[in-house]
Amino acid sequence: MHCPFCSAVDTKVIDSRLVGEGSSVRRRRQCLVCNERFTTFEVAELVMPRVVKSNDVREPFNEEKLRKGMLKALEKRPVSADDVEMALNHIKSYLRGTGEREVPSKMIGNLVMEQLKKLDKVAYIRFASVYRSFEDIKEFGEEIARLQD
């Protein structure tokens, strides 16, 4: 690593520590030429799979789209931002863990419903009604009955 002070190539690592939830490494370095110390952070570059929509169109995974969909269902519900972030992280971890380059959008929708069901039943019904295109009140009732089982 080049020294940010004198641009020398020779630096040594003095200290390394895990930060975050073990997802990154903080390294304290010292330049062997000018003796200045500096800190670097290393994070693994994790690639999300592409999303295959129902019409076979492929698009990059969009975390913001996922977040907005969940937040819309959770609007005015008593769920903390931390709980939402944990649910989003669970979904992303699962998708990365598949090892697939592409995943169907249906899988993502089902993962969202699974997480919403754990977070808030009303938000789950809201999301399911749009995701599954409920046509009438009967379909709402059937889904609510399944939740109560």
Swiss-Prot record:
Domain of life: Bacteria
PROSITE patterns per the UniProt record, alphabetical: ATP_CONE
MF-aspect GO terms: ATP binding; DNA binding; zinc ion binding
ATP-cone domain location: 49-139
Zinc finger (unnamed): 3-34
Keywords: ATP-binding, DNA-binding, Metal-binding, Nucleotide-binding, Repressor, Transcription, Transcription regulation, Zinc, Zinc-finger
Record field: transmembrane: none
Pfam families: ATP-cone, Zn_ribbon_NrdR
One annotated GO biological process: negative regulation of DNA-templated transcription
Entry's cofactor comment: Binds 1 zinc ion.
Cofactor(s) in the UniProt record: Zn(2+)
Family under the similarity heading: Belongs to the NrdR family.
Described function: Negatively regulates transcription of bacterial ribonucleotide reductase nrd genes and operons by binding to NrdR-boxes.
Protein name: Transcriptional repressor NrdR
Organism, as annotated: Enterobacter sp. (strain 638)
